Swiss-Prot record:
The species this protein was found in: African swine fever virus (isolate Pig/Kenya/KEN-50/1950)
Lineage: superkingdom: Viruses
UniProt-recorded name of the protein: Protein MGF 300-1L
Topology with respect to the bilayer: Single-pass membrane protein
Reported function: Plays a role in virus cell tropism, and may be required for efficient virus replication in macrophages.
Disulfide bonds: none
GO cellular component: host cell membrane; membrane
Side of membrane Cytoplasmic, spans: 1-175
Protein location: Host membrane
Amino acid sequence: MASLATCCLKNIVNQHAHLENTVLLYHLGLRWNCKTLYQCTQCNGVNYTNLHSDQCKNKDLFLMKVIVKKNLAVARTLLSWGASPEYARLFCRNTEEEQALNLQHVAEVPSHKILERLTMSYKENDEQLLITFYLLNLSTNVSANLREQVRFNIVSYIICDLAIHQTFKIFYAKNYSLSTLYCIFLAIYYKLYTALRKMVKIYPGIKPFAYLIGFMFDDETVTETYSSTDDEILECKNKIIAIKGYYGNIHCRSDIAHMYAFSQNNFW
């Protein structure tokens, strides 16, 4: 059953979603990017039209985004609509933000739950992969130990194909995190182009990596994600042809000891 606060917010947004009431709506956390927020009654997501469509947004993903942008008013609204307080806590930068969102007593998300997202949930849809991407790349509270676990899981997945490994290595050397590269890789592998477009928007410099992975799988749809010159695309095509030509038939050992060694910095 919806809480009294949720019912009040719904009534306010339905009665006062007019231009002259934007100050009230902003104060109540019902406006984002100059648009009024509605809770979809069909999919339980969030939208700007009060109508269900494929533009409805996942509440947890939206919550992560607004906390990163420091909009605690909207964050409170999303929490009242059922967004995950556990994930909200991972994105709070200090105790003041936790207190403002009443998250002091919320349990931390266990490491294995985040790892489970990395290894399974991203296959569901674009939004699930974006949640994984936000958790690993934009959360301030993911522990160093968890990042190492994630690093090990990623490396154990990719090292059996040295062509893929070499492509990762080129961009890892440019100071992109392994988890960022891996999320881009998954978006292309599972053809989650909406997620890919949003991730590349956050890290524009990673676009050539997306092209290289796309060409590795003969997927030229990736080039439509963002505009590039013909020369940029041709350069990526030639580079991946060279990488596949040199490494294409080489495979690594897959035992645990070798995977762990490969995950250390001297192999990257």
